[in-house]
Regions:
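Short beta-strand
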Residues: 767-769, 819
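Inter-lobe coupling/hinge segments of SF2-like helicase ATPases
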Residues: 280-287, 291-295, 304-747, 754-755, ...
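Accessory, non-ATPase domains that flank or precede helicase/AAA+ motor cores in DNA-metabolism machines
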Residues: 1-449, 456, 461-477, 760, ...
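A generic structural motif
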Residues: 13-15, 25, 44, 537, ...
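C-terminal effector/interaction modules appended to NTPase cores
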Residues: 779-781
Length: 827
């Protein structure tokens, strides 16, 4: 019997699937994994067909599937299994999970078309003969006549433009003089506005614009736009210009009308690769450690059985070449390969590396997938993979769902990185999901890192993972020498507070004289951390979040790095109106400015989310640094990992201990990892490297052991702390947040949930909270937090699922409760 019903996962925030009837016309094309268009309430949604059945649901009226989008199922069977696992493990709505797995769909509009019926045409003739018509009849005549004259259906979105149109249409439909039919339309390719400073504007236009009297704010806005649109950076997308210059679209339009700006539209498209200079392939000579690791991986791939290996290798030990050769082996055996990297920026480098390494052998068989690609390009790459045209995929977290078939090898580079964890629904972990995918595919998963997460290294020690080790750098190059600079002693000696110690400045001066490069890490964006009033002690806060605003000098704005809110810098304190406002702390922007003052002849650039808002800008800066066109690169943590700069002999770490103050049990681990990773950027070429770590807390074990680059000692010490405090890997952990814009709702719901969780203590589950979250207000929502610890994963899952069911019974909105399983951040 032909299945007549289909279970469909829809991208709605509900932990359930929906049943639809399969019409006879689609019976042969609706299969598990198909993307289907279905009616949902008053709109059309794209969903995934999960399974077919001929069992009659217990619902009287079943809506039908409208359309099948693709000639072949979008998701192969193993990916459907993986999606169901993600939804179950992370307690996520199935539809949200499958939406994350699918390529961007050309957006749909569900409209009604109104057609003239036979009786409608007769009624139109009657109305035409009337000398005097009522107001309702006038509206009905206009609507019917429009349909008759145009000779085609009227779209429902045009009714609002006709006087009395919606009401007239309702009457005509009720009387059968119009008929309605649902239509699904595809939206056009997305475009973006590009803005450039018009250097070719006639002189009379420029002088006229200058002579016109303008308010101070208008002149300031124009200067900020001129500053942002420099010749060096070139044209910018409108959205980036508005953010960086802190101006409105109206300001841009005014300057465009004056001829000072040029504005045009172009499709969102992939930008060209600017990583030409400084790009080198790894050496072809493997050392003995690399050969042993590769032989192990080859044996696992040949066995065709699920295996997880942890490749622990010090920075510069040649893990990348092991990855590439392992992929070669998998391809030679007819399997496909997936390489995950933690940052979008690294996909550019690794993708180009793979294309250069495999060259014509794969005939353009390398695909790059990440969320920053324009929808059209991402869909194109995704379907190349699905059709089997690409056999190697490089991507970030979301690429774990790439539709590769016959998968043989999954590589997770820098597996410890928190960016593998999705911070929005569905809150899956890319590394752990990759391991489960490898299990479903009987494939090999290789996790690589110089600073493995405690959980992964613990699993390797316990025998759950196989441990591979690279303990020496390629060509036996020494690790960089690390020196700790005690900023307390520096302050006592110089009475100077700020970044870039005397030792660091002297070391940079030496590198400038020798012609080598310096890399300076400061993990703070902006110019100053916040603005403080010396009169009342208040800091200028975000209107939407319980966080201080960061000062960005280039934009002359105070900015919230959580919600994007910004405001002008106040001349007086908003709280007490004191004029004594003080800019506290030093960020990457200020450090760059000070280094330019200190070394006026040096070629200095900054790389952070403010200067590298597009792929082009990111590539331009890194490409210039790799090619030796820059002397000093200042950056946030995006410069700390994965890059191979042969001429860097000095790495400076400014304010190395700021992350230690965070209220998070992983704070020490993150600090150790960041310092070790950035230290690994020095001395990767033939010249030895030096690392200077500036800190006010030099005795902390994370600082001390990072300076010694002693991962095993750090692992033992941190593991002891985790065991004492019952944190992972010794317990299963979940973070539950209750949120709402009304604080009374958030308080009431969190108390109700606390009442439900209280009895769970008797089942061995430790419940901490509710308490105000560390970020108590975010995007105008008040947030209260629970932390649940359980000795076994199954216990925790049952308790969380029961808690969500309790919320549904108490009519607590699903959107008000966030469940984060295996959280990497407690914010």
């Amino acid at each position: 019997m032909v299945p007549r019903f289909c279970e469909v996962a829809l991208a709605v925030p509900l932990r359930t699937t929906f049943t639809y009837a399969v019409p006879d016309s689609l019976a042969e094309v609706v299969v598990a994994g198909s993307r289907v268009v279905v009616p949902f309430r008053n709109r059309a949604l794209v969903g995934v067909a999960l399974g077919l059945t001929d069992r009659q649901p217990e619902v009287e009226q079943i809506k039908e599937i409208v359309e099948v989008l693709d000639p072949i199922p979008a998701l192969p069977p193993r990916l459907i299994e993986l999606g169901c696992w993600v939804a179950s493990y992370y307690l996520a709505p199935p539809g949200e999970v499958f939406r994350a797995m699918l390529p961007p769909v050309v957006e749909l509009r569900h409209e009604r078309e109104l057609r003239l019926t036979v009786s409608g045409r007769e009624y139109l003739e009657e109305l035409a003969a009337l000398a005097n018509r009522s107001e309702a009849e006038v509206a009905e005549h206009a609507l019917l006549q429009l349909s008759e004259v145009e000779g085609k259906p009227i779209r429902s979105d045009r009714l609002g433009k006709l006087p009395g149109g919606p009401a007239a249409a309702a009457r005509l439909l009720r009387r059968g003089q119009l008929e309605a039919r649902g239509v699904t339309r595809h939206r056009r390719t997305r475009t973006q506005k590009i803005v450039a400073w018009n250097i070719e504007a006639p002189m009379e236009v420029q002088s006229m614009a200058k002579s016109q009297a303008k308010p101070q704010t208008a002149r300031e806005a124009e200067e900020r736009i001129r500053h942002v649109l420099t010749d060096e950076r070139g044209p910018l997308p409108m959205r980036l210009l508005l953010g960086e210059a802190g101006v409105t679209p109206a300001t841009v339009e005014r300057l465009a009308k004056l001829g000072k700006l040029r504005v045009w539209e172009e499709p969102l498209a992939v930008e060209e690769d600017l990583f030409e200079a400084g790009f080198t392939l790894p050496t072809n000579v493997l050392n003995e450690e690399q050969k042993r690791a590769l032989a192990e991986i080859q044996a696992w791939v040949d066995a065709g059985a699920f295996t997880v290996g942890l490749l622990y290798g010090v920075t510069g030990s040649g893990k990348t070449e092991v990855y590439l050769r392992a992929v070669e082996m998998a391809l030679a055996r007819g399997r496909t390969a997936l390489i995950l990297v933690p940052e979008i920026a690294l996909t550019l480098w690794v993708g180009r590396l793979c294309r250069a390494w495999f060259g014509a052998r794969l005939n353009d068989g390398v695909a790059v997938l990440h969320s920053a690609l324009p929808d059209v390009e991402r869909a194109r790459e995704w379907w190349r993979v699905r059709r089997g045209e690409a056999r190697v995929v490089v991507g970030t977290r979301s690429a774990v769902f790439a539709p590769l078939e016959n998968l043989g090898l999954v590589i997770v580079d820098e597996e410890q990185e928190s960016s593998y964890k999705q911070e929005e629904t569905p809150r899956y972990h890319g590394r752990d999901t990759a391991i489960v995918r490898a299990k479903l595919e009987s494939a090999v998963a290789v996790l690589g890192s110089a600073t493995p997460s405690l959980e992964s290294f613990h699993h390797a020690r316990e025998g759950k993972y196989r441990l591979l080790q690279l303990e020496t750098r390629v060509e036996n190059r020494p690790l960089a020498r690390v020196e700790v600079v005690d900023l307390r002693e520096e302050f006592r000696r110089t009475h100077r507070f700020g970044s870039a110690s005397e030792a660091l400045r002297a070391a940079m001066s030496e590198r400038l004289e020798s012609g080598t490069q310096s890399l300076v890490l400061i993990n703070r964006r902006g110019y100053s951390w916040f603005v403080l009033c010396r009169g009342c002690g208040a800091a200028v806060q975000c209107e939407n979040c319980s966080i201080s605003l960061t000062y960005h000098k280039r934009r002359e704005r105070l900015v919230c790095h959580y919600c994007g809110y910004s405001r002008r810098v106040p001349k007086t304190c908003p709280k007490c109106e004191s004029e004594h406002v003080y800019f506290f702390g030093e960020g990457a922007e200020q450090l760059e400015e000070r280094l330019r003052e200190e070394f006026p002849g040096a070629r200095i650039a900054r790389l952070d989310r403010d200067t590298a808002r597009t792929k082009r800008e990111y590539q331009r800066v890194l490409g210039a640094f790799a090619a030796g066109k820059l002397d000093i690169l200042v950056g946030t943590q995006m410069v700390a990992k994965g890059h191979d700069f042969q001429r860097v002999t000095l790495v400076g770490v400014v304010a190395a201990d700021t992350s230690l103050a965070l209220p998070d049990f992983r704070a020490a681990e993150r600090t150790f990892q960041l310092l070790t990773q950035v230290a690994g950027r020095a001395g990767r070429g033939e010249l030895p490297g030096v690392v200077l770590v500036e800190t006010y807390y030099p005795e902390h074990y994370a600082i001390q052991l990072a300076a010694r680059q002693d991962y095993r000692a750090f692992f033992e010490k941190e593991l002891h702390f985790r065991r004492l405090m019952h944190y992972p890997p010794f317990t299963a952990l979940a973070n539950v947040i209750v949120r709402d814009r009304k604080v009374e709702n958030a308080v009431r719901w969190s108390r109700q949930l606390a009442g439900f969780f209280a009895p769970q203590e008797s089942h061995g589950i430790k419940v901490l909270g509710p308490a105000a979250a560390p970020l108590a207000r975010l995007r105008r929502e008040y947030r209260f937090q629970f932390l649940l610890k359980a000795p076994r994963r199954a216990q925790l899952t049952r308790a969380l699922a029961a808690g969500l069911d309790f919320c549904a019974r108490k009519q607590i909105p699903e959107s008000a409760v966030i469940v984060d399983v295996d959280p990497v951040s407690l914010f």
